[in-house]
Amino acid sequence: MRTLVTGAAGFIGSTLVDRLLADGHGVVGLDDLSSGRAENLHSAENSDKFEFVKADIVDADLTGLLAEFKPEVIFHLAAQISVKRSVDDPPFDATVNVVGTVRLAEAARLAGVRKVVHTSSGGSVYGTPPAYPTSEDMPVNPASPYAAGKVAGEVYLNMYRNLYDLDCSHIAPANVYGPRQDPHGEAGVVAIFSEALLAGRTTKIFGDGSDTRDYVFVDDVVDAFVRAGGPAGGGQRFNVGTGVETSTRELHTAIAGAVGAPDEPEFHPPRLGDLRRSRLDNTRAREVLGWQPQVALAEGIAKTVEFFRNKSQ
């Protein structure tokens, strides 16, 4: 199968590229390298089934690109990923995450693409939900332009499915972590803690550490993307999480243990807009896609710490 991965040089995108190549698929990777890193694709570049195109989905000739490469399935991970930037500059966020998605959908329609697997956000589209674990049947309640853009992307792609028969599915990951995650961004607390503790730097927890998140390992998320690229789940959003809540304080303790560093974070006032809880119901992904998480948190943390330890040497 011939595939296109947008955001291919990112943390999740590059891991997906490696998985698709390992499964024997041809992959065209598209990324403008504004946040993704070329080094994430070093392994992929050794494959004769991989081609890389440096381009921005907002202004690239997507119609020409898709006509040339003729992918059967598009995995759409290219995005503006900073919630803070979306709040500071909503038009920019919408340009990338909404207009970019619509441009891709239109090019896919014209090229006869079978399916687009779109990246939504299990951690933000529900806002503060009325129940935990949170299922896809809960109303969306975006609390940021970033979340609103993800919902808009879903709506547009579902419209393309209904009007033009361009199939789509939406992967809504919980808090993804693992090797290649950016330790310098606003999110990615596992990477942030891992790198800081390995370097002997002080770590910060915002709030009292009781906030919880649903942490899911990147390989498990990639498996959900691959499964969603098949015929099942058209037009549906799939929560991809473990269904297990872990507090920030518990997470820090686990990472400090894996590193062999003191478990002594600094505590700072909570940040405006941070959610108190997050826990996703993954029943739909289990039942429709046959997906289930395979990597427990302790194992995933060990793999992540090993990655950053090797990188620092």
From Swiss-Prot:
UniProt GO MF annotations: UDP-glucose 4-epimerase activity
Biological or metabolic pathway of the protein: Carbohydrate metabolism; galactose metabolism
Residues noted as binding substrate in the record, renumbered to the chain: 121, 146, 175, 189-190, 204-206, 213, 271-274
Gene Ontology biological process terms, A to Z: galactose metabolic process
Gene3D superfamilies for this protein: NAD(P)-binding Rossmann-like Domain (3.40.50.720), UDP-galactose 4-epimerase, domain 1 (3.90.25.10)
Cofactor: NAD(+)
Keywords: Carbohydrate metabolism, Galactose metabolism, Isomerase, NAD
Designated name of the protein: UDP-glucose 4-epimerase
